[in-house]
């Protein structure tokens, strides 16, 4: 069989397989590209989402209201209620937290 005969007989299958491969690669790159390595913050007694936004919103380049809305959505929080001992993901890349200030003083210390 020559290539022309193979193409004439199986062109639909060949195009389908190539399309699936391309879409699979695009999907894989998209999924791997969205692993943003966002930071996780532990909630202490008396903390609120707005207090966390006051501290971290400037590092995320978001207004505080958008920051709080993002945290509520991504952490499945209802009405922004958090309790001590919880941890929430915030839209600040880990590298921005590491580069910002090497000495962090906790509120309860």
Swiss-Prot record:
Subcellular location: Cytoplasm
Entry-linked Pfam families: LysM
Domain LysM per the UniProt entry, residue ranges: 39-90
UniProt xrefs under InterPro entries: Cell_div_suppressor_YneA, LysM_dom, LysM_dom_sf
Main location: cytoplasm
GO cellular component, one term: cytoplasm
GO terms classed as biological process: division septum assembly; DNA repair; negative regulation of cell division; SOS response
Keywords (A to Z) from UniProt: Cell cycle, Cell division, Cytoplasm, DNA damage, DNA repair, Septation, SOS response
Similarity comment: Belongs to the YneA family.
Function as written in the Swiss-Prot or TrEMBL entry: Inhibits cell division during the SOS response. Affects a later stage of the cell division protein assembly, after the assembly of the Z ring, by probably suppressing recruitment of FtsL and/or DivIC to the division machinery.
Name of the protein in question: Cell division suppressor protein YneA
Organism this protein belongs to: Listeria welshimeri serovar 6b (strain ATCC 35897 / DSM 20650 / CCUG 15529 / CIP 8149 / NCTC 11857 / SLCC 5334 / V8)
Source organism phylogeny: Bacteria, Bacillati, Bacillota, Bacilli, Bacillales
This protein's encoding gene: yneA
């Amino acid at each position: 069989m020559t290539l022309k005969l193979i193409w004439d007989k199986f062109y639909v299958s060949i195009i389908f397989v190539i399309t699936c491969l391309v879409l699979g690669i695009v999907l894989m790159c998209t999924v791997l590209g969205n692993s943003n390595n966002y930071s996780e913050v532990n909630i202490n007694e008396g903390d609120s989402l707005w207090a966390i936004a006051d501290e971290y919103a400037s590092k995320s380049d978001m207004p505080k209201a958008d920051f709080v809305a993002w945290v509520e959505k991504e952490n499945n929080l209802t009405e922004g209620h958090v309790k001590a001992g919880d941890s929430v993901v915030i839209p600040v890349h880990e590298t921005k937290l590491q580069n910002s200030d090497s000495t962090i003083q906790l509120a309860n210390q």
